[in-house]
Regions:
Chain B
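ABC-type ATPase nucleotide-binding domains, specifically the catalytic core motifs of the NBD
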Residues: 13-16, 109-122, 131
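Helix-to-loop junction immediately C-terminal to a conserved catalytic motif
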Residues: 56
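Conserved ABC transporter NBD signature motif
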Residues: 64-72
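Short coil-to-helix segment of the ABC ATPase nucleotide-binding domain corresponding to the Q-loop/switch region
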Residues: 102-110
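Conserved ABC ATPase signature
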Residues: 141-145, 149
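A short, proline-enriched helix->beta-strand linker immediately N-terminal to the Walker B motif
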Residues: 160-164
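Catalytic Walker B motif of ABC-type/P-loop ATPase nucleotide-binding domains
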Residues: 166-169
Length: 380, 223
């Protein structure tokens, strides 16, 4: 038998002989590792998950012309290429024009847009009736609808007089939906871009492009800066209200994750340390004998450290698997989507678990090294 | 090899302070030489075990030095002293001490396995176990042995490494007459082969095997 084999046998046999104690230590390491790997998984996945949740509160970036000139649809599309397609959840163009409602002799703001995109960038827009499907259908904001007494399926006449003519362009539009947002949008009338082009006689112009991008605050800032740098006539800005609250919530959540992980790992250390102290007390005679036979303090340290790290290894592997299951349950129940396993998490959890186990063994090892063989062999 | 104790002493303080210094072993000069078997007799509590531990590098004397040839045992650091003890000094302790997680054979091999691994270790351990009638217990664990068997196992453990100095504390304490003879003959044989053997005992039978006889009373050694 080789020395290494005997060392391994002593470590494993010692662990097996004290199964119940070691099971407690192993369980506490596994629980610590579970919380560690589970929370770290959530920690790294939360920005993505929370980003998706926050996208429900509206666009987080807007694109506007930096000068007096209007923005063209082509220019806006060009700017969007900076943002990776998988991160761009929606981009809604808006063109605002003051139009006259002939029958009421009043002027309102008409917002021309792409209704399909609106639903992805502003999912909180609530429509009574339905979304417009054709160019002769409009949404009327709730406030406007109440002011002018318009109801679903009413036909309204919108007119616009271009500056360079004396003739008004007029379109008859059917109200297919009443829009409720709780914001300024309730004062607008929403049409398609095509209808607005027909009404104004000018096509391809935009005032603003609202974007919903699934990215962290810093990344968003980088995209905005890149767009503004590449296009001197365009300016990309973050919707601070949304991005700031997203960053604040994430920072608080991540601090909480760190705190909980730290507390659980501390408790794990206390539990493992107490168990190993009891093991040292039980093996006092044996340690004394081994010292008398020529074992150095270093070899006693190595043996207990070996036992602790072996427990850390097992607990780390077990904890990684349980942690992933834990993170999956949390993700599915809280965010409604599953997460993918990060392979790097296994070595990280195992190394941290082994480190925690090694740290927990420091005090018991000190006790073991301090055992006086002369006292033990005398039976004291 | 010569083991020499030079004015070694060990004392303890009682609670009332330095005036009540209690000597476990009073200042003593002794010498153990290769090829001799020395028997140290004395009553329980007379300081025999303390004296043996000081000679074996297990207990630092409060005064004096222990020399092995020209090496001051207690001038070495822990790693050096541990290795030296493992290589040159065999110790049979008083109680029933064994590593519970190892088999009888592995326990006997343990001291030699600490710093080396060769097949000869196995042979030597086999031989000593056979000699003490324990060949059938090689794979057994210490918890399955009787007191006498544990005692013989620890003597086999000390002898298997062929130490140059062998310090045995009550090596025949749990043994019947037959096994006492077996063990004392083995110790005698080790001395005849060049080992310096010290047997600490309170059994007068051991005196028949001795080259030197010492007596200890209340920490004072007389030759």
């Amino acid at each position: 038998m080789s020395r290494r084999k005997m060392f391994l046998k002593m470590v494993t046999a010692s662990l097996l002989r004290r199964r119940s104690r070691m099971l407690i230590a192993l369980l506490s390491i596994a629980i610590g590792a579970t919380i560690l790997s589970g929370l770290v998984t959530i920690y790294y996945d939360v920005p993505r998950q929370m980003g998706a949740q926050f996208r429900g509160y509206g666009a987080n970036m807007i694109l506007v012309p930096s000068g007096e000139e209007k923005m063209t649809v082509e220019k806006a599309q060009e700017c969007l290429t900076v943002i990776p397609k998988d991160q761009l959840l929606g981009a809604t163009p808006y063109r605002y024009v003051n139009v006259e409602m002939t029958s009421r002799q009043r002027t309102f703001v008409a917002a021309a847009t792409d209704f399909e995109q609106v639903q992805s960038t502003s999912p909180y827009f609530a429509v009574e009736g339905r979304w417009p499907e054709g160019d002769r259908e409009v949404l009327v904001g709730k406030e406007t609808a109440e002011t002018i007494g318009v109801k679903l399926n009413n036909v309204i006449e919108l007119s616009y007089k271009p500056e360079d003519t004396y003739v008004k362009n007029t379109l008859n539009m059917t109200v297919v939906g009443i829009l409720e947002t709780g914001g300024d949008e309730e004062a607008y009338i929403f049409t398609t871009l095509k209808a607005m082009d027909a009404l104004t006689g000018v096509s391809g112009q935009l005032d603003v492009m609202e974007m919903s991008v699934s990215a962290a605050s810093e990344e968003l800032e980088n995209y905005a800066a890149e767009i503004s740098e590449n296009n001197s006539d365009m300016s990309a800005r973050l919707v601070k209200r949304v991005t700031k609250s997203e960053t604040t919530v994430l920072a608080k959540l991540q601090s909480l994750v760190f705190l909980v992980t730290a507390v659980v790992l501390l408790l794990t250390m206390i539990c493992v340390s107490t168990t190993m102290m009891a093991v040292v007390s039980e093996r006092r005679k044996e340690i004394g004998l081994r010292k008398a036979l020529g074992a150095s303090d270093q070899s006693i340290r190595a043996e207990f450290l070996g036992e602790g790290m072996f427990l850390g290894l097992l607990g780390g592997i077990l904890g990684t698997a349980l942690g992933f299951a834990f993170a999956q349950v949390v993700s599915v129940n809280v965010f409604g989507s599953s997460i993918t396993f990060q392979p790097l998490l296994l070595p990280i959890t195992v190394i941290v678990s082994m480190g925690i186990a090694a740290l927990s063994c420091l005090l018991p090892i000190r006790r073991a090294v301090e055992i006086d063989p002369a006292l033990v062999l005398k039976g004291e | 090899m010569i083991l020499r104790a030079e004015k070694i002493a060990k004392w303890y303080y009682r609670k009332s302070g330095e005036s009540n210094r209690f000597f476990a072993v009073s200042e003593t000069d002794v010498q153990l030489e290769s090829g001799s078997l020395t028997v140290l007799m004395g009553r329980s509590g007379s300081g025999k075990t303390t004296f043996l531990h000081m000679l074996g590098g297990l207990l630092i004397p409060d005064a004096g030095k222990v020399w092995v040839d020209d090496k001051d045992l207690y001038a070495m650091n822990d790693a050096e002293l541990s290795r030296y003890r493992n290589r040159h000094i065999g110790i049979v302790s008083q109680g029933h001490t064994a590593v519970q997680s190892l088999s009888v054979l592995e326990n006997v091999m343990l001291p030699q396995m600490m710093y080396a691994d060769t097949d000869r270790i196995n042979e030597s351990a086999d031989e000593w176990l056979a000699r003490f009638g324990m060949e059938h217990l090689q794979e057994a664990f210490p918890s399955e042995l009787s007191g006498g068997e544990l005692r013989r196992m620890s003597i086999a453990r000390a002898l298997a490494g062929k130490p140059e100095i062998l310090l045995a504390d009550e090596p025949t304490g749990d043994l019947d007459d037959e096994n006492t003879k077996l063990v004392m003959n083995a110790l005698r044989e080790a001395a005849d082969e060049g080992t310096a053997v010290l047997v600490v005992t309170h059994e007068s039978d051991a005196l028949d095997y001795a080259d030197q006889r010492w007596q200890m009373n209340a920490g004072v050694l007389t030759k």
